[in-house]
């Protein structure tokens, strides 16, 4: 892990150290332009598993453990953006399940692997089913 990354993780750790928790929320809505919700999120293991026009989740996050939070923006105008964002959210949820007990450098590597795996899955699905893309 380079010095810049180490500083980032230490800053986050210091900010979260203490007895208080952090109340978080995620909301995704289809908006006024699209017919379907192409976006997704990851919040304490919750993702938008439905095809509804909006989704939400709430969580109190403890400073005593690592958390993976994610935003996955399905690429608008490309068919299957909602599939790509959901698949990516699922990959990151599985990766985050491995965080407990890991060091910052191990978490960084798990995150890198999650990006790589999600990219591989989307590329494979894209050629077969015209799945779009997502920004994570």
Predicted features by range, described:
Residues 1-136:
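PP2C/PPM-type serine/threonine phosphatase catalytic domain
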